[in-house]
Amino acid sequence: MRKALSAVALVAVWSVAGSLPAGAAQPSWSGDYSVERFAATKTGTSLAASQWEPDFADVYTFETTCTDDTCVATVVGGPAPANPTLPQPARYTWDGASWVHPYDWEWDCWMGEGNPKVWAPAHSEAYYTPQPDGTLVGSWRTDIASGPCAGSVIMDVAAYPVDPPPAFGSGS
């Protein structure tokens, strides 16, 4: 009986393995994307989470490279960040469901008009999950270690593909 069950289990495993695509496509986040951060609706425990700021977006060019089982989407074009402590270039690693970018940097805590910013160590993790329509949606969480802005800041993020202009003579 035990041999029969083992044989059935082995056949079932072979059946499932045989139904998987032989050369499944590797994930890719390449091309121009408008990356939007929904700062106006951010949340968290930090003083910074309650300071109003508008949503903001910039267009970035991403390029994906894969080696073995690891795929990384790197920002290869776009505006430089205002905060010089942000690691450059930004690199997002595919975790099987989302593009994830963990990094350490210095948060620049705004202390009001005319007052110097207070800098503090911070750790962020941004993730973007591909959607069926080609967009990516996710969240950006920052944990600020110390200072007047100590605590968390969490905001929704999204990336929208930027369509290239029509080619000359394409009739579009």
Roles of regions detected by a PLM:
Residues 37-41, 64-66, 79, 142-144, ...:
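Beta-strand elements of well-folded, non-transmembrane domains
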Residues 39-51, 81-84, 108-117, 143-152:
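Short, cysteine-centered beta-strand-loop-beta hairpins and adjacent loop/turn segments enriched
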Residues 137-172:
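Edge beta-strand at a domain terminus
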Residues 1-24:
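Secretory targeting and sorting signals
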Residues 25-50, 79, 136-140:
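Tryptophan-anchored aromatic micro-motifs
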Residues 25-32, 63-70, 92-99, 127-136, ...:
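A short, structured loop/turn motif at beta-sheet edges
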Residues 118-145:
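Internal, hydrophobic beta-strand segments that form the core of beta-sheet-rich folds
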Residues 53-123:
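Predominantly extracellular/secreted and cell-surface proteins with exposed
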